[in-house]
């Protein structure tokens, strides 16, 4: 099964290559072929070129945005790119700043068989935002529960099937 990990980056190349190194050291079974797509959001700092070979990562590609467009646009661009140009079964967008734990990839991969092509959502357990952000976020969750009756735990850290990516691209979700 081919897995594409999408990592947006703006200037923080050191963190991205640290994350890739951590992904490389995960105990991933041979059932999965891991590739990384870095989406460079028009960084104005020089990229740290790592010529290191990663034995558990099949390939690393860098897509360069022409201008800085932000994290969400980078993920959307990466998803569109892999849908149109790459062979894959699932995509995992990740933050390159260390907020998403690479160990959770193992949990995603375990859940793929039972996911029925539905998105698998990771929940951040460690947040580094300030107190005001956390209070507002809790208020947002309370309002959501009040109006929908459901607790929605969602972030960018997801595992998306190719079918889900296709729907997102075709329907411009």
Predicted features, each with a name:
Residues 21, 25, 80, 84, ...:
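Short, well-ordered alpha-helices that flank and scaffold nucleotide-derived cofactor binding pockets
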Residues 3, 32-36, 60, 89-94:
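Residue-level recognition of the N-termini of beta-strands and the immediately preceding loop/turn
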Residues 66-67, 71-81, 90-93, 99-173:
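Acceptor/aglycone-binding surface of glycosyltransferases and processive sugar-polymer synthases
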């Amino acid at each position: 099964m081919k897995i594409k990990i999408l990592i947006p980056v703006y200037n923080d190349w050191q963190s991205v290559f640290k994350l890739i190194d951590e992904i490389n050291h995960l105990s991933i079974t041979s059932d999965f072929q891991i590739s990384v797509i870095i989406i460079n959001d028009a960084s104005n700092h020089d990229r740290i070129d790592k010529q290191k070979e990663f034995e558990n990562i099949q390939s690393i590609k860098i897509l360069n945005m022409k201008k800085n467009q932000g994290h969400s646009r980078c993920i959307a661009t990466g998803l569109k790119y892999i849908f149109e140009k790459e062979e894959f079964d699932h995509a995992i967008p990740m933050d390159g700043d260390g907020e998403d734990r690479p160990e959770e990839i193992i949990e995603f991969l375990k859940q793929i068989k039972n996911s029925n092509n539905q998105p698998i959502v990771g929940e951040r357990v460690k947040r580094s935002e300030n107190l005001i952000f956390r209070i507002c976020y809790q208020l947002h969750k309370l309002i959501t529960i009040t109006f929908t009756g459901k607790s929605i735990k969602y972030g960018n850290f997801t595992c998306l099937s190719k079918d889900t990516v296709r729907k997102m691209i075709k329907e411009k979700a």
